[in-house]
Structures are given as structure tokens and as C-alpha cells.
């Protein structure tokens, strides 16, 4: 084919030809049909959906992706025993003495959540932790866990 036979298009409206695009398959039957045709099939789980992509749940989605892609067992994040001991100690202290139910009511959460926090097995929830800090007047996050948030003046 010589230069006389080929067409060279110049201009802003010039586009390339059609390309094979990536398609999203919804449903098991379409997936099976693609596999029968011998097409390349890759599956990915979408963790963030809708408007939640830019919010705090994106971090959780990243963690789930990490867990999904790793071969070894990834241990879930917990508040730890230091926080658990601080909550238990403060709840039984004089002046702050209260049951788990009373603490749950004041923190606007359930008794089971309080029990998980006192066991040290709960996932760190900033809303619950800040409510507990306010009610118990101790620090549960940062470096000096268990110290009084606003100590009494001498």
C-alpha cells in the first residue's frame, strides 16, 4: 500500500478506530458465557459504593482490600488491653462508679459495645471512644491512656 492509497486525517475531530473496552459483567450467566468464549476474566470486589467513596469508610475499604489480597491471616484492629483496663478501672473508681448499662446509656451506645471495649476486643470506634472520654474524664486515645483529661486544680 503506497502513500497515495492511505488516508491521513488532520484536525481536532479526528478520532481513532474502535477499541475493545473493558466491560462489567453482572450476573453468573454472563460470567460463564465470557469464560466459555475464552475471554480474560478478572473479579474485583468493590468496597466503596455511591457517595461513600470520599468519606471515612474509604479507609475501611482499603483495609478490606488489603485483607482480600493477602495470603496470610490479617488480624483485625482492636482497642487493646491498655484501653480496656483504663475503662474498667475508671468505671469502678469512687466518684465515677457506674454499671456497664449506665455507662452505655451515657455514651449513647449498647451494653455489648461497652463489654467489647472492656474486654479489649472491640474495633476502635472514634465516636464511642470520645463519648467514653467525656463521660469518664480520662484519655483513651493517644500517648497517655488512662490519665485524667481535665485534672482537678490544686
From Swiss-Prot:
Keyword Transcription: yes
GO cellular component terms attached to this protein's record: nucleus
Molecular function terms, GO-annotated: DNA binding
Protein keywords: Activator, DNA-binding, Transcription, Transcription regulation
A Pfam family per the record: HTH_3
Cystine residue pairs: none
Domain HTH cro/C1-type, chain residue ranges per copy: 87-143
InterPro entries per UniProt: Cro/C1-type_HTH, Lambda_DNA-bd_dom_sf, MBF1_N
Keyword Coiled coil assigned: no
Feature: DNA-binding region: 100-119
The organism's place on the tree of life at top rank: Eukaryota
PANTHER family: ENDOTHELIAL DIFFERENTIATION-RELATED FACTOR 1 (PTHR10245:SF15), ENDOTHELIAL DIFFERENTIATION-RELATED FACTOR 1 MULTIPROTEIN BRIDGING FACTOR 1 (PTHR10245)
Protein family: Belongs to the MBF1 family.
Function field: Transcriptional coactivator that stimulates GCN4-dependent transcriptional activity by bridging the DNA-binding region of GCN4 and TBP (SPT15), thereby recruiting TBP to GCN4-bound promoters. Involved in induction of the ribosome quality control (RQC) pathway; a pathway that degrades nascent peptide chains during problematic translation. Required to prevent stalled ribosomes from frameshifting.
Protein name per Swiss-Prot or TrEMBL: Multiprotein-bridging factor 1
Source organism of this protein record: Emericella nidulans (strain FGSC A4 / ATCC 38163 / CBS 112.46 / NRRL 194 / M139) (Aspergillus nidulans)
Source organism phylogeny: Eukaryota, Fungi, Dikarya, Ascomycota, Pezizomycotina
Recorded name of the encoding gene: mbf1
Amino acid at each position: 500500500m503506497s502513500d497515495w492509497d492511505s488516508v491521513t486525517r488532520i484536525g481536532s475531530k479526528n478520532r481513532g478506530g474502535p477499541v475493545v473496552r473493558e466491560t462489567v459483567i453482572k450476573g453468573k450467566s454472563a460470567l460463564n458465557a465470557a469464560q466459555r468464549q475464552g475471554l480474560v476474566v478478572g473479579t474485583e470486589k468493590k468496597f466503596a459504593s455511591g457517595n461513600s467513596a470520599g468519606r471515612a469508610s474509604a479507609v475501611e475499604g482499603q483495609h478490606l482490600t488489603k485483607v482480600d489480597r493477602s495470603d496470610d491471616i490479617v488480624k483485625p484492629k482492636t482497642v487493646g488491653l491498655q484501653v480496656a483496663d483504663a475503662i474498667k478501672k475508671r468505671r469502678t473508681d469512687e466518684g465515677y462508679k457506674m454499671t456497664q448499662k449506665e455507662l452505655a446509656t451515657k455514651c449513647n451506645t449498647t451494653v455489648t459495645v461497652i463489654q467489647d471495649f472492656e474486654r479489649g476486643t472491640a474495633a476502635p470506634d472514634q465516636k464511642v471512644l470520645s463519648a467514653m472520654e467525656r463521660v469518664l474524664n480520662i484519655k483513651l486515645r493517644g500517648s497517655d491512656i488512662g490519665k485524667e483529661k481535665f485534672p482537678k486544680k490544686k
